[in-house]
Regions:
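N-terminal leader/signal peptides at the extreme start of proteins
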Residues: 1-10
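N-terminal helix-rich module
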Residues: 2, 16, 28-54, 58, ...
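Short, contiguous hydrophobic alpha-helices characteristic of membrane insertion segments
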Residues: 9-31
């Protein structure tokens, strides 16, 4: 004789356990996605800035004229900064358009940028605090040989993004380096 098996299917307990596990995994992935998304915003801002600075350096070499760059921390913008009293002193701003991070990088409203001159300091060992709103500006000059008159450290910060991003322009060579921040400064061993 055969035993009556009833209808085949899953029990309510099995379904509840499965739904609970799927919910937990989905919750964990959403948290991870948000952190990765913010880290990608910082990576994009650093990449755009590095490319813009490199092009400004090339313009100084091509035109055989120093290019002064103005860095506006509050607006997250970079622009060529000619001398209005002596237009021949620096590159005119008509040679290269400004870089405005908020317009270039999508969803970058929470990014904070800070900068500081490097006075014979190693950017890998220079700590730069970057929290809260920033104001003021910095400047940088690329010479006709592509060198920089002063070094500068630029840092991009976004809350809960993990590691911040930093860019260093090394004086006197004008070398532009990009990396992630560490507890003691910047790590330039891997750019991204």
């Amino acid at each position: 004789m055969r035993a009556d098996r009833g209808k085949a299917g899953y029990t309510l307990v099995e379904l509840m356990v499965t739904v609970s596990l799927v919910g937990i995994l989905a919750g964990l992935s959403i948290v991870s996605f948000g952190r990765n998304w913010r880290a990608e915003r910082l990576k994009a801002a650093a990449g755009e800035t590095t490319a813009w600075l490199d092009e400004a350096r090339r313009i100084a070499i091509q035109k055989a004229k120093p290019c002064r760059i103005s860095i506006n921390r509050a607006e997250l913008s970079f622009s060529l900064d000619p001398n209005p009293d002596n237009p021949e002193e620096f590159c005119p701003d008509s040679l290269y358009g400004p870089l405005e991070i908020r317009n270039t990088v999508q969803n970058s409203g929470a990014i904070v940028m800070c900068s500081s001159e490097l006075e014979n300091g190693d950017p890998a060992q220079t700590s730069l605090s970057c929290s809260g709103s920033q104001s003021g500006s910095s400047s940088l000059i690329f010479t006709p040989r592509g060198t920089a008159t002063t070094g500068i450290l630029i840092k991009f910060h976004m809350p809960e993004a993990g590691a911040d991003r930093c860019i260093a322009v090394m004086a006197p060579l004008g070398q532009i380096r990009s990396g992630k921040t560490t507890a003691t400064g910047c790590d330039f061993t891997t750019a991204y």
